[in-house]
């Protein structure tokens, strides 16, 4: 036993070998894992470093670029995001001649450089100034090593490249410059039948099922690339009435933009929209300038783009271009694209421009078109403009005819025509405000034309014929009657009751918004005294006799009659509609009538002061008369006694019932007296063979009586044995006292 040597822990060997072998194997595994991770990290860093020079022709990279291009977002002004610059081919190809472009790429930039450094360096050189500088960044915010410099014109870019010999020194490092040209790419194709964009791999339209070959045959080759290649600036032929100003400073205000554009165009604050960030409340770098027409916008754009030096606002060079709409473009049969929104705005702008031109330029205004026929891609719009030329000429002729001086109260005429280019339909408000102005001036001007005489002559209103919605802004106030005269229909309008009076038929009418017509009011409510003065176009003697009457008396009579009319007709109108109209039509009528009567309500608020001034003396006299008629000594009126006489004395209230206290159940001892045999547990045990009085278990060895806690025996002192008188913990104080008294009595015996 003494010769046996105990084996140490280090020398043990068993099923899994010695401990040294296991430690060595673990160290080798950890070192190999560490080496693999370091190699993987080094490979990732190397790939990121040379990410810009990868093979961009591989199918995997092509799919990734397509995915990024689809997911890339565009800003509100249509300017390209950073992902869209991947469409440019910035690979080095020494075997191909570079194609000149107005976009120049700076390659090999330091990582810590930013856009401001590049912009300051480029602007410090003499010669053409750039329109925009864009530094490409990663998601982490670091530079990718290249940037794009955009010029207004191709000549400026080529001259700048020749002046700097295609090299630029930034932070002591020579940077190579190259022309950036977009590579031909295959995009999503547009169906010419339904106008839906389809994925480029889809052979049939997703909506209508038209074949892709049909769209390719109708659209000439290269039509899909034409808009995309010129997406940056106005070389694509896109025309709009709005201009975008880029490279706006973060703290530039609207007044600075107005002062900078003041030498070239006259603008107001409402013509400029400065886009700001919602969080920082600073400018986002661009603003929009809205001009009356596309012609003025193109002229201003041409002036600003040819400025040398370029336009600067708060020390920043401003880039100018047409503002593009965010709507989908439409493809014409000849392959050119144009926005549907610009078509509608084109016709409206042309109509407004032609109506506001002076008489000597009427010929030019009639021939004006928003998109000229000679421009490329706008041949169809020339035909559209010819369809609307008769409408423009009629508008211009109306302006020429209305040469009579207008009254001070007549509103300024405004063209509110709307044109839809899908079908050459014209929508015009009947009864322009210019007629009202000429009718007013006809009474004072000795020589008046036939058109003004027709405007002043009221036309007979035919019930059931649809008319245009009444425009209260064109009504003229008649001092003799105190009402407003409608020169279009020849009716007199009362803003208080919103009823019309026809002087030809001596009939009262009201406007029905659902039927779009004037309906006669009910008869038999006293129309004779409600006829306004000057309404009947009779002889001059009758007019003079009516004018000689006191105005206050006439106005007072008319006010009383119209109030009486309003009350009776409103009741009849409500009863008639409620009895014959279904529930569904009532809801629609409420909406339409609310829209139709909105102008009347606003007009009534505006003209309320005129009626108050006119009827104020009469109302004061009426109030004085009513006060005089009141009894001098007003006695106290016991309304409670009158109520008792009329309805009798009410019965006294019933006496309140006495409240009975509910029986109190001692919730602490619910089973003190035991439970009966009707409970579920007892029934289940009896079903299994248990009988009352026997214990539980296989051999009925369980207890039959409930377990009760015994109270500690109380002793009188040391060594003295106490007594137990059978008091339980569940006993009350009275029961315990009774048991104690009984135990003492038994011990004494």
From Swiss-Prot:
<dbReference type="GO" id="GO:0043065">
    <property type="term" value="P:positive regulation of apoptotic process"/>
</dbReference>
<dbReference type="GO" id="GO:0005634">
    <property type="term" value="C:nucleus"/>
</dbReference>
<feature type="compositionally biased region" description="Basic and acidic residues">
    <location>
        <begin position="627"/>
        <end position="648"/>
    </location>
</feature>
<keyword id="KW-0539">Nucleus</keyword>
<keyword id="KW-0747">Spliceosome</keyword>
<dbReference type="GO" id="GO:0003729">
    <property type="term" value="F:mRNA binding"/>
</dbReference>
<keyword id="KW-0694">RNA-binding</keyword>
<dbReference type="Pfam" id="PF17780">
    <property type="entry name" value="OCRE"/>
</dbReference>
<keyword id="KW-0479">Metal-binding</keyword>
<feature type="region of interest" description="Disordered">
    <location>
        <begin position="1"/>
        <end position="88"/>
    </location>
</feature>
<keyword id="KW-0508">mRNA splicing</keyword>
<dbReference type="InterPro" id="IPR034991">
    <property type="entry name" value="RBM5_RRM1"/>
</dbReference>
<comment type="function">
    <text>Component of the spliceosome A complex. Regulates alternative splicing of a number of mRNAs. May modulate splice site pairing after recruitment of the U1 and U2 snRNPs to the 5' and 3' splice sites of the intron.</text>
</comment>
<feature type="region of interest" description="Disordered">
    <location>
        <begin position="570"/>
        <end position="595"/>
    </location>
</feature>
<dbReference type="Pfam" id="PF01585">
    <property type="entry name" value="G-patch"/>
</dbReference>
<comment type="similarity">
    <text>Belongs to the RBM5/RBM10 family.</text>
</comment>
<keyword id="KW-0677">Repeat</keyword>
<keyword id="KW-0507">mRNA processing</keyword>
<feature type="region of interest" description="Disordered">
    <location>
        <begin position="626"/>
        <end position="680"/>
    </location>
</feature>
<feature type="compositionally biased region" description="Low complexity">
    <location>
        <begin position="429"/>
        <end position="460"/>
    </location>
</feature>
<dbReference type="Pfam" id="PF00076">
    <property type="entry name" value="RRM_1"/>
</dbReference>
<dbReference type="GO" id="GO:0003723">
    <property type="term" value="F:RNA binding"/>
</dbReference>
<feature type="domain" description="G-patch">
    <location>
        <begin position="677"/>
        <end position="723"/>
    </location>
</feature>
<dbReference type="GO" id="GO:0008270">
    <property type="term" value="F:zinc ion binding"/>
</dbReference>
<dbReference type="InterPro" id="IPR012677">
    <property type="entry name" value="Nucleotide-bd_a/b_plait_sf"/>
</dbReference>
<dbReference type="GO" id="GO:0005681">
    <property type="term" value="C:spliceosomal complex"/>
</dbReference>
<dbReference type="InterPro" id="IPR035979">
    <property type="entry name" value="RBD_domain_sf"/>
</dbReference>
<feature type="zinc finger region" description="RanBP2-type">
    <location>
        <begin position="185"/>
        <end position="214"/>
    </location>
</feature>
<protein>
    <recommendedName>
        <fullName>RNA-binding protein 5-B</fullName>
    </recommendedName>
</protein>
<dbReference type="InterPro" id="IPR036443">
    <property type="entry name" value="Znf_RanBP2_sf"/>
</dbReference>
<dbReference type="InterPro" id="IPR000504">
    <property type="entry name" value="RRM_dom"/>
</dbReference>
<feature type="region of interest" description="Disordered">
    <location>
        <begin position="425"/>
        <end position="471"/>
    </location>
</feature>
<dbReference type="InterPro" id="IPR000467">
    <property type="entry name" value="G_patch_dom"/>
</dbReference>
<dbReference type="InterPro" id="IPR001876">
    <property type="entry name" value="Znf_RanBP2"/>
</dbReference>
<keyword id="KW-0863">Zinc-finger</keyword>
<dbReference type="GO" id="GO:0000398">
    <property type="term" value="P:mRNA splicing, via spliceosome"/>
</dbReference>
<keyword id="KW-0862">Zinc</keyword>
<dbReference type="GO" id="GO:0000381">
    <property type="term" value="P:regulation of alternative mRNA splicing, via spliceosome"/>
</dbReference>
<dbReference type="GO" id="GO:0000245">
    <property type="term" value="P:spliceosomal complex assembly"/>
</dbReference>
<dbReference type="InterPro" id="IPR041591">
    <property type="entry name" value="OCRE"/>
</dbReference>
<comment type="subunit">
    <text>Component of the spliceosome A complex (also known as the prespliceosome). Appears to dissociate from the spliceosome upon formation of the spliceosome B complex (also known as the precatalytic spliceosome), in which the heterotrimeric U4/U6.U5 snRNPs are bound.</text>
</comment>
<dbReference type="Pfam" id="PF00641">
    <property type="entry name" value="Zn_ribbon_RanBP"/>
</dbReference>
């Amino acid at each position: 036993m003494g010769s046996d040597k105990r084996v140490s822990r280090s020398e043990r060997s068993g099923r899994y070998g010695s401990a040294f072998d296991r430690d060595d194997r673990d160290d080798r595994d950890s070192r190999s894992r560490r080496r693999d991770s370091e190699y993987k990290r080094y490979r990732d860093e190397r790939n990121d470093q040379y990410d810009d020079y990868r093979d961009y022709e591989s199918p995997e990279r092509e799919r990734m670029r397509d995915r990024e291009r689809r997911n890339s977002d565009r800003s509100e002004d249509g300017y390209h995001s950073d992902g869209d610059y991947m469409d440019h081919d910035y690979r080095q190809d020494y075997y191909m001649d570079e194609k000149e472009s107005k976009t120049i790429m700076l390659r090999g930039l330091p990582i810590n450089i930013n856009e401001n450094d590049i912009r300051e360096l480029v602007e410090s050189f003499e010669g053409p100034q750039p329109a925009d500088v864009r530094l490409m960044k990663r998601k982490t915010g670091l530079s990718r090593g290249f940037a794009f410099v955009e010029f207004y014109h191709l000549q400026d870019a080529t001259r700048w490249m020749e002046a700097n010999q295609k090299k630029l020194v930034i932070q002591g490092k020579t940077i190579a410059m190259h022309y950036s040209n977009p590579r031909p790419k295959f995009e999503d194709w547009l169906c010419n039948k339904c106008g839906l964009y389809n994925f480029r791999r889809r052979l049939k339209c997703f909506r209508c099922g038209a074949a892709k070959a049909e769209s390719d045959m109708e659209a000439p080759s290269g039509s899909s690339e034409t808009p995309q290649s010129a997406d940056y600036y106005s070389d694509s032929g896109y025309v709009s009435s709005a201009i975008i100003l880029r490279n706006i400073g973060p703290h530039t205000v609207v007044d600075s933009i107005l002062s900078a554009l003041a030498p070239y165009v006259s603008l107001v604050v409402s013509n400029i929209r400065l886009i700001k960030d919602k969080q920082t409340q600073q400018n986002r770098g661009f603003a929009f300038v809205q001009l009356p027409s596309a012609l003025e916008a193109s002229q201003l754009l041409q002036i600003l783009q040819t400025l040398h030096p370029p336009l600067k606002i708060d020390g920043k060079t401003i880039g100018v271009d047409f503002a593009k709409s965010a709507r989908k473009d439409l493809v014409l049969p000849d392959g050119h694209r144009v926005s549907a929104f610009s078509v509608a705005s084109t016709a409206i702008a042309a109509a407004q421009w032609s109506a506001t031109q002076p008489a000597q330029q009427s010929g030019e205004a009639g021939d004006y078109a928003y998109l000229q026929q000679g421009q490329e891609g706008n041949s169809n719009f020339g035909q559209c403009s010819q369809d609307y030329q008769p409408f423009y000429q009629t508008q211009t002729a109306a302006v020429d005819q209305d040469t009579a001086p207008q009254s001070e109260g007549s509103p300024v005429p405004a063209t509110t025509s709307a044109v839809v280019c899908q079908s050459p339909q014209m929508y015009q408000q009947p009864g322009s405000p210019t007629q009202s102005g000429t009718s007013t001036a006809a009474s004072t001007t000795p020589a008046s034309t036939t058109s003004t005489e027709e405007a002043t002559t009221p036309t007979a209103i035919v019930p059931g014929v649809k008319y245009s919605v009444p425009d209260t802004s064109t009504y003229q106030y008649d001092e003799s009657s105190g009402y407003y005269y409608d020169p279009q229909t020849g009716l007199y309008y009362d803003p208080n009751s919103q009823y019309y009076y026809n002087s030809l038929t001596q009939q009262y009418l009201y406007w029905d918004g659902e039927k779009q017509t004037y309906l006669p009011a009910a008869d038999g409510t006293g129309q004779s005294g409600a006829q306004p003065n000057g309404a009947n176009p009779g002889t001059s003697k009758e007019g003079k006799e009516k004018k000689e009457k006191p105005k206050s008396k006439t106005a007072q009579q008319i006010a009383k009659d119209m109030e009486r009319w309003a009350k009776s007709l409103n009741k009849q109108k409500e009863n008639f509609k409620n009895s014959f109209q279904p529930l569904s039509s009532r809801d629609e009528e409420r909406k339409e009538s609310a829209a139709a009567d909105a102008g009347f309500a606003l007009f009534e608020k505006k003209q309320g002061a005129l009626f108050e001034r006119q009827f104020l003396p009469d109302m004061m006299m009426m109030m004085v008369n009513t006060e005089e008629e009141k009894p001098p000594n007003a006695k106290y009126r016991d309304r409670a006694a009158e109520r008792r006489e009329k309805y009798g004395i009410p019965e006294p209230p019933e006496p309140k019932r006495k409240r009975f206290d509910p029986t109190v159940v001692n919730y602490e001892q619910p089973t003190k007296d035991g439970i009966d045999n009707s409970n579920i547990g007892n029934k289940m045990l009896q079903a299994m063979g248990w009988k009352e009085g026997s214990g539980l278990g296989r051999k009925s060895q369980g207890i039959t009586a409930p377990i009760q806690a015994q109270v500690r025996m109380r002793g009188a002192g040391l060594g003295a044995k106490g007594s137990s008188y059978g008091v339980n913990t569940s006993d009350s104080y009275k029961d315990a006292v009774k048991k104690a008294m009984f135990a003492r009595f038994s011990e004494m015996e």
